[in-house]
From Swiss-Prot:
Membrane topology reported for the UniProt record: Peripheral membrane protein
Annotated organism of origin: Maricaulis maris (strain MCS10)
GO molecular function terms noted in the UniProt entry: GTP binding; GTPase activity; guanosine tetraphosphate binding; ribosome binding; translation elongation factor activity
InterPro entries to which the protein is assigned, alphabetical: EF-4, EFG_III/V, EFG_V-like, EFTu-like_2, G_TR_CS, LepA_C_sf, LepA_CTD, LepA_IV
Classification via NCBIfam families: lepA, small_GTP
Protein name: Elongation factor 4
Cited function: Required for accurate and efficient protein synthesis under certain stress conditions. May act as a fidelity factor of the translation reaction, by catalyzing a one-codon backward translocation of tRNAs on improperly translocated ribosomes. Back-translocation proceeds from a post-translocation (POST) complex to a pre-translocation (PRE) complex, thus giving elongation factor G a second chance to translocate the tRNAs correctly. Binds to ribosomes in a GTP-dependent manner.
Pfam families for the chain: EFG_C (PF00679), GTP_EFTU (PF00009), GTP_EFTU_D2 (PF03144), LepA_C (PF06421)
Similarity comment: Belongs to the TRAFAC class translation factor GTPase superfamily. Classic translation factor GTPase family. LepA subfamily.
Length: 602
């Protein structure tokens, strides 16, 4: 039995972090009876422990709700809950492509934020009908009229008939459901008997069933027992089962045009089920694939090393497991003289990096050292070839390099105007070019072009502290640009420490180098001989600190007598220290690495 597409509504909820979209999803599930009172818990759709704890949504989730509207018809509503954070923009992108409309949730006390903007523009790009919803109107600080004006000024959406709700108390939830049914369009009616065409929206790994794929059927019918082909990879799989989430899994016979559901087909790895791929019938394939998805490109790279080198195998297993579930995370093995065996991993951004690191530490109990995050540099060599550099330690001889290009981003920052000066100074310090500056009410919208290298380090933390937490920030990649970049090595006791080398802009090398040397001077324990700590660009030392030696007071036993006696003892000690320094090894403790990599810019 296929459902009449005019009774289906596929919609997603877009919002900035903490504006209450997961709570709204909970209420919608509760009102339509998706779960009994007893099974309800906060943030039903955020399954990952980390998601609940940080209150952020990382993986997109879906749920199918049956709702009997005021016109007496029963509608099938497919809700896709999307993440709100920049790093997971690819999750948002593909969730939106599977829907026809969006609910734009804005906190009535906070107003429009940078990520609200970013996600709304993505929804507009895929031609969504958008219904504004003002949440948290039960708060004393709520100013719905001001926020409506803001939505109209900043985003340009008509907010006169925005739905007023409080997801926490359940106020206005019925109005949201009515708005979904009346104001959002149904999916385009596909032919249920045509060749199967379905878009793969998401995929994750289930330890019992293999990979489970979330699909949105465009044309044809997806049934249990048929053989499907993924058009991107060409691989074929028998369908073991199809079903829907309400939010618990429920098997059904078939999925028709416009419907969203899951299929499991003994696929071994999430990498085989590429998001955005087209699923079709192997016997009667569709002529051409749906307009595809760009695979997510990792932007930030860093090394992950186990604190205890005996845990390397456990780390490998944990990383492989995480990669099963996260196709945008890439990894390869690497070794470091200072840290031993580990992995060089690619992430979508800093939050993604932090989330993965926390999951490794928490779900697999592995203590990790993370090296300084770096971006991918494109090296144009003198012989005309191009190299992508993921790790600053692998940089070839500078003589052979013609130019080095680094990725630039366009950053959109929304900030209350009293903090604007500090934010502009921060962007200027980070080699930014101002693109525009506009005001919406008492908030300034600043758009800057910045090198990603400068943002990766700690831009977000600095931005938050300058603006006392009020600024919101969102970025997208624009292009690679050639810059005057050099590799800076850190030498401890004349030995280069590979884990601390980094690529910096020549103008800021001395500053960065000096800060690093000072930091290491505090962190490395004193030895029996003096240790020079230097920052070098090629053969030129740009900064130096000296860690003085621990020494015994050798002249304590001399009372009076000849000065040459004292001199002899001091010279003997000096000769000993010199010999010691030749053969001595400096042990840099792991805490020193970790702290040095968290270096801030002041």
């Amino acid at each position: 039995m296929t459902i009449d597409p005019s009774l289906i509504r596929n919609f997603s909820i877009v919002a900035h972090i903490d504006h209450g979209k997961s709570t709204l999803a909970d209420r919608l599930i509760q009102v339509t009876g998706g779960l009994t009172q007893r099974e309800m818990k906060e943030q039903v759709l955020d399954n990952m422990e980390l998601e609940r704890e940080r209150g952020i949504t990382i993986k997109a989730q879906t749920v199918r709700l049956d709702y009997t509207a005021k016109d007496g018809k029963t509608y099938v509503l497919n809700l896709i809950d999307t993440p709100g954070h920049v790093d997971f923009a690819y999750e948002v992108n593909r969730s939106l492509a599977a829907c026809e409309g969006s609910l734009l949730v804005v906190d009535a006390s906070q107003g429009v934020e940078a990520q609200t903007l970013a996600n709304v523009y993505q929804a507009i790009e895929v031609n969504h009908e958008i219904v504004p919803v003002l949440n948290k109107i039960d708060l004393p600080a709520a100013e719905p009229e001001r926020v409506k004006e803001q939505i109209e000024d900043v985003i340009g959406l008509d907010a006169s008939d925005a739905v007023m709700i409080s997801a926490k108390t359940g106020l206005g939830i019925e109005d949201v459901l009515e708005a979904v049914v009346t104001r959002l369009p149904p999916p385009a009616a596909g032919d249920p008997n045509g060749p199967l065409k379905a878009m793969l929206v998401d995929s994750w790994y289930d330890p019992y069933l293999g990979v489970i794929c979330l699909v949105r059927v465009i044309e044809g019918t997806l049934k249990k027992g048929m053989k499907v082909r993924l058009m991107g990879t060409g691989a074929t799989y028998p369908v073991d089962g199809v079903g829907v989430f309400r939010p618990k899994k429920e098997a059904i016979d078939s999925l028709g045009p416009g419907e969203l559901g899951y299929l499991n087909a003994s696929i071994k790895q999430v990498r085989d089920a590429r998001v955005g791929d087209t699923v079709t019938d192997d016997r009667r394939p569709a002529d051409k694939a749906l307009t595809g998805y760009k695979p997510a490109q990792p932007v930030v790279f860093c090394g992950l090393f186990p604190v205890d080198s005996a845990e390397f195998e456990d780390l490998r297993e944990a990383i492989e497991r995480l990669a099963l579930n996260d196709a945008s995370f890439s990894y390869e093995m690497e070794t470091s003289a200072a840290l031993g065996f580990g992995f060089r991993c690619g992430f979508l951004g800093l939050l993604h990096l932090e989330v993965i690191r926390e999951r490794l530490e928490r779900e697999y109990n592995i203590e990790l050292i993370t090296t300084a995050p770096s971006v991918v540099y494109r090296l144009h060599m003198n012989d005309g070839s191009e190299i992508d550099l993921h790790n600053p330690a692998d940089m070839p001889d500078p003589v052979k390099i013609d130019t080095i290009a680094e990725p630039w981003i366009k950053a959109t920052i929304l900030v209350p105007d009293e903090y604007l000066g500090g934010v502009l100074k921060l962007c200027q310090d980070r080699r930014g070019n101002q693109v525009e500056l506009t005001y919406a009410g008492n908030r300034a919208l600043v758009v800057y072009e910045l090198p990603l290298n400068e943002v990766v380090f700690d831009f977000y933390d600095r931005l938050k502290s300058i603006s006392k937490g009020y600024a919101s920030f969102d970025y997208q990649w624009i292009e690679d640009r050639v810059g005057d970049l050099v590799r800076m090595s850190i030498l401890v006791n004349d030995e280069p420490v590979d884990a601390l080398s980094m690529v910096v802009h020549r103008a800021r090398a001395e500053l960065r180098g000096r800060a690093m040397c000072e930091k290491l001077k505090e962190l490395i324990p004193r030895h029996m001989f003096k240790i020079p700590i230097q920052a070098a660009l090629g053969g030129r030392i740009v900064a130096r600190e000296t860690l003085s030696a621990l020494r015994k007071d050798v002249t304590a036993k001399c009372y009076g007598g000849d000065a040459s006696r004292k001199r002899k003892l001091l010279d003997k000690q000096k000769a000993g220290k010199k010999k010691m320094r030749q053969f001595g090894k400096v042990e840099i403790p792991q805490e020193a690495f970790i702290a040095a990599l968290k270096m801030d810019d002041n």
